[in-house]
Amino acid sequence: MAVLEILTAPDPRLRVQSKEVTDVAAVQTLIDDLLETLYETDNGVGLAAPQVGREEAIVVIDLSENRDEPLVLVNPKVVSGSNKEMGQEGCLSVPDYYADVERYTSVVVEALDRDGKPLRIETSEFLAIVMQHEIDHLSGNLFIDYLSPLKQQMAMKKVKKHNKLRAR
């Protein structure tokens, strides 16, 4: 297992459309690496393969306090949603910036688990929001794409400042 570098905006690899995984057995190491990378962050609850420069349609999420209940979603799709609300979001690929984004508060997601078995998850509240956020990454979308141009500029200024500090 390895901790991978998390890309930050405006890295063009974050905008790449993910490719469907056809052989789940072939991505087990990537799944392990995504989880290890997620667990190395201070406050991350989800990570998508494009955030580490990979094109596979894989998302990992862990909302547990002890970070020991991973949810692995391969080829996930939001098949329905209801009750939109505004809520604050952040992103490991847009460090140090948070903004209100409108999302469904209840969703149905279909995916494969890490063993290739079909999953259908009906969920609400925070998990529903995290799933939508991470699945957006698979389409090359970031949460800041839902913001006004002015707020997008503010977000990118924060990211540039973060990257300068990190480069020291």
Curated annotation (Swiss-Prot):
<dbReference type="InterPro" id="IPR036821">
    <property type="entry name" value="Peptide_deformylase_sf"/>
</dbReference>
<dbReference type="GO" id="GO:0046872">
    <property type="term" value="F:metal ion binding"/>
</dbReference>
<dbReference type="InterPro" id="IPR023635">
    <property type="entry name" value="Peptide_deformylase"/>
</dbReference>
<comment type="similarity">
    <text>Belongs to the polypeptide deformylase family.</text>
</comment>
<keyword id="KW-0378">Hydrolase</keyword>
<comment type="function">
    <text>Removes the formyl group from the N-terminal Met of newly synthesized proteins. Requires at least a dipeptide for an efficient rate of reaction. N-terminal L-methionine is a prerequisite for activity but the enzyme has broad specificity at other positions.</text>
</comment>
<feature type="binding site">
    <location>
        <position position="133"/>
    </location>
    <ligand>
        <name>Fe cation</name>
    </ligand>
</feature>
<dbReference type="Pfam" id="PF01327">
    <property type="entry name" value="Pep_deformylase"/>
</dbReference>
<keyword id="KW-0408">Iron</keyword>
<dbReference type="GO" id="GO:0043686">
    <property type="term" value="P:co-translational protein modification"/>
</dbReference>
<feature type="binding site">
    <location>
        <position position="137"/>
    </location>
    <ligand>
        <name>Fe cation</name>
    </ligand>
</feature>
<dbReference type="GO" id="GO:0006412">
    <property type="term" value="P:translation"/>
</dbReference>
<feature type="binding site">
    <location>
        <position position="91"/>
    </location>
    <ligand>
        <name>Fe cation</name>
    </ligand>
</feature>
<feature type="active site">
    <location>
        <position position="134"/>
    </location>
</feature>
<keyword id="KW-0479">Metal-binding</keyword>
<keyword id="KW-0648">Protein biosynthesis</keyword>
<protein>
    <recommendedName>
        <fullName>Peptide deformylase 2</fullName>
        <ecNumber>3.5.1.88</ecNumber>
    </recommendedName>
</protein>
<dbReference type="GO" id="GO:0042586">
    <property type="term" value="F:peptide deformylase activity"/>
</dbReference>
